[in-house]
C-alpha cells in the first residue's frame, strides 16, 4: 500500500513519458502524462458556476512549466441554437437546449506570444494548444479516480491507414492571377488586418455517421461542438467569428443519396439546403458530415468562392479520423474554399502543411498560409459577400458582456480584446480618451480616416466606397448597381 501511494505521489510531481498507448484519438507512439492543476480566480466564498468564464491550469511539458489561460468561447452558439433529430415515423423533433454554461474554451500559453489553444473542459481537458511553434494534443486518460492527461504531438499518432487523404477540389496552378491581383490592390494597414466578419454555421450529420457512434445523439453533439470550437479558433487570425446556429442529425434515414463522388453529394446537399434547411433557420454556410468513403481518397469538397449563395455555400466532409482536431481542420479547409481560398502550392506558399494544403500531412498545421490570406482578401474585396458582414444581433448570441469575445454587445463601444489595445479600454469596453474608433475600414490609429478616401474598391459596374469622416465603418455607396 505504501509503495502504491509513493508511486502516485511521484506521478503527480514528475510527468511520465510512455512509449505507446491507445487513446480516444488513436494509438499514440510517444506521449507524456501530465496532471493539470487548476488555479482558481474566483474570490473566496463566491458561487462557482459549473464552467467558469475564465480558468487557468498549470502542468509540465517536456519538463518545463506551462500555464494555460482559458476563456469561455462566448459567441460559439446562437441564442436560438437548435438541435434536430427524427422519430421512427419520420417526425421532426427540434429542441432548443440551454448552452449558456457550456464547456468550450479558447486561450493561450503564458509568456508565449504566438501560442493558441482550443480546449473542451466538459470531462477533463481535451483539445489542442500551440507551444513554442509546436502543436500538441491533450486528452484525459481513462483511469479511475485520476486527473491524469496525455499530452502528445499530432505526428506521434499512428495513421489509421496509409492511403493519402486529400481534398477533392482541383484548380490549375498555371494561373495565380488572384494572388497577383491581391498584391496589386492598395490596402490600408487597417484593411490588411482583415475586417471583422461573422459566419453562422449549420452542421448536418448523415445517418451513416449517426450509426457509427452507436446512434448516441449526445456523443455526436459533443463531437460536433468540439469541432466547431476548433474551427472558431482556427478562423480567429482572419478576424472571423464562427457561431453555431443549428445541428441537424439524420437519425432515421438520409434525406439525400450520399454518394461516393464528393462533388455530386455536395450538389445534392446544396439543393436540400436551399429547399429545406434554410427554411428552418437562417444561416450563412452549411456542412454535411458523413461516414461515407468518398472516391479517390477524397475527404472533403466545397464550392470555390460561393459564400452566402443559398445553394452553393456548402461543404461535405468525411468523418475521416477519430481525432476531432483533424476533422475540424478539414472542415475549416472546406470553409476556406467557400471563402475564395485555393489550395496551397508548396513551391509558392510559405507553409509546409497549412490548412489549405491539398493533402493531409503528418505535421498538419492549424494556420492559414500567406497565399490563403491573399486569396481571402481578394475574395472580400472583389465579391464582398453580404451575409457575413453583420454581427449576430445582441439577442442572437448567448453571451454576457466580456471584452475580446469578437462581438459588440450591450453597453460596449468597442470589443477590446487584449489590455494592450490602444483604442479600447479592456476593463470597460469603452473607447480610450481621444479615440474616435477601434475598428473598421475607415479607422486608422484610433481616428476616423478623412472624408473622400477610398475604403472599398469597385467591383464590376459598381462604384468605389469612400470614408465619410464621421465613422470607422466603410459606408456603402447609395448608387451601387
Curated annotation (Swiss-Prot):
The keyword Protease applies. Disulfide bonds join 308-387, 349-371, 351-354, 414-429, 416-424, 423-446, 437-443, 442-467, 455-474. InterPro entries: Disintegrin_CS, Disintegrin_dom, Disintegrin_dom_sf, MetalloPept_cat_dom_sf, Peptidase_M12B, Peptidase_M12B_N, Reprolysin_adamalysin. Keywords: Cell adhesion impairing toxin, Disulfide bond, Hemostasis impairing toxin, Hydrolase, Metal-binding, Metalloprotease, Platelet aggregation inhibiting toxin, Protease, Secreted, Signal, Toxin, Zinc, Zymogen. Coiled coil: none annotated. Gene3D superfamilies: Collagenase (Catalytic Domain), Disintegrin domain. GO terms for molecular function: metal ion binding; metalloendopeptidase activity; toxin activity. Binds 1 zinc ion per subunit. The active site is at 334. CDD domains: ZnMc_adamalysin_II_like (cd04269). Residues 400-481 form the Disintegrin domain. Residues 197-392 form the Peptidase M12B domain. GO terms for biological process: proteolysis. Its EC number is 3.4.24.-. Monomer. The disintegrins belong to the medium disintegrin subfamily. The sequence shown is that of elegantin-2a. Belongs to the venom metalloproteinase (M12B) family. P-II subfamily. P-IIa sub-subfamily. This is Zinc metalloproteinase/disintegrin. It comes from Protobothrops elegans (Elegant pitviper).
Amino acid at each position: 500500500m505504501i509503495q502504491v501511494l509513493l508511486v502516485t505521489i511521484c506521478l503527480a510531481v514528475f510527468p511520465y513519458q510512455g512509449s505507446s498507448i491507445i487513446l480516444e484519438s488513436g494509438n499514440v507512439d510517444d506521449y507524456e502524462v501530465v496532471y493539470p492543476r487548476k488555479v482558481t480566480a474566483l474570490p473566496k466564498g463566491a458561487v462557482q458556476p459549473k464552467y467558469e468564464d475564465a480558468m487557468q491550469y498549470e502542468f509540465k511539458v517536456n519538463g518545463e512549466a506551462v500555464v494555460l489561460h482559458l476563456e469561455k468561447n462566448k459567441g460559439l452558439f446562437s441564442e436560438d441554437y437548435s438541435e434536430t433529430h427524427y422519430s421512427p415515423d419520420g417526425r421532426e423533433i427540434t429542441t432548443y437546449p440551454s448552452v449558456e454554461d457550456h464547456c468550450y474554451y479558447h486561450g493561450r500559453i503564458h509568456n508565449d506570444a504566438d501560442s493558441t489553444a482550443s480546449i473542451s473542459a466538459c470531462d477533463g481537458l481535451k483539445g489542442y494548444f500551440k507551444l513554442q511553434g509546436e502543436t500538441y494534443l491533450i486528452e484525459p486518460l481513462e483511469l479511475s479516480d485520476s486527473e491524469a492527461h496525455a499530452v502528445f504531438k499530432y505526428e506521434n499518432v499512428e495513421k489509421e491507414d496509409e492511403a493519402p487523404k486529400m481534398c477533392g477540389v482541383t484548380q490549375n496552378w498555371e494561373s495565380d492571377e488572384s494572388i497577383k491581383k491581391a498584391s496589386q490592390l492598395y490596402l490600408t494597414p487597417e484593411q490588411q488586418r482583415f475586417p471583422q466578419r461573422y459566419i453562422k454555421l449549420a452542421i448536418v450529420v448523415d445517418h451513416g455517421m449517426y450509426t457509427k457512434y452507436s446512434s448516441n445523439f449526445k456523443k455526436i453533439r459533443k463531437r460536433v461542438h468540439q469541432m466547431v470550437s476548433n474551427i472558431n479558433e482556427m478562423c480567429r487570425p482572419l478576424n472571423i467569428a464562427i457561431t453555431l446556429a443549428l445541428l441537424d442529425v439524420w437519425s432515421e434515414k438520409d434525406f439525400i443519396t450520399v454518394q461516393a463522388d464528393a462533388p455530386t453529394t455536395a450538389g445534392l446537399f446544396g439543393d436540400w439546403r436551399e429547399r429545406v434547411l434554410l427554411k428552418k433557420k437562417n444561416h450563412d454556410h452549411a456542412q454535411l458530415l458523413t461516414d461515407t468513403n468518398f472516391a479517390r481518397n477524397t475527404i472533403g469538397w466545397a464550392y470555390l468562392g460561393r459564400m452566402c449563395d443559398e445553394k452553393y455555400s456548402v461543404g461535405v466532409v468525411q468523418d475521416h479520423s477519430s481525432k476531432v482536431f483533424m476533422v475540424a481542420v478539414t472542415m475549416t479547409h472546406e470553409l476556406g474554399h467557400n471563402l475564395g481560398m485555393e489550395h496551397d502550392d508548396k513551391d509558392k506558399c510559405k507553409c509546409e502543411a497549412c490548412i489549405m494544403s491539398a493533402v493531409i500531412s503528418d505535421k498538419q498545421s492549424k494556420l492559414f498560409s500567406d497565399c490563403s490570406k491573399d486569396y481571402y482578401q481578394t475574395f472580400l474585396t472583389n465579391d464582398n459577400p453580404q451575409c457575413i458582414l453583420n454581427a449576430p444581433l445582441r439577442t442572437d448570441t448567448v453571451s454576457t458582456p466580456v471584452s475580446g469575445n469578437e462581438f459588440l454587445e450591450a453597453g460596449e463601444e468597442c470589443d477590446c480584446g487584449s489590455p494592450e489595445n490602444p483604442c479600447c479600454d479592456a476593463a470597460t469596453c469603452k473607447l480610450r480618451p481621444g479615440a474616435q474608433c477601434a475598428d473598421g475600414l475607415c479607422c486608422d490609429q484610433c481616428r476616423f480616416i478623412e472624408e473622400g478616401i477610398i475604403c472599398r474598391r469597385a467591383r464590376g459596374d459598381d462604384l468605389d466606397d469612400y470614408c465619410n469622416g464621421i465613422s470607422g465603418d466603410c459606408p456603402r455607396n447609395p448608387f451601387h448597381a
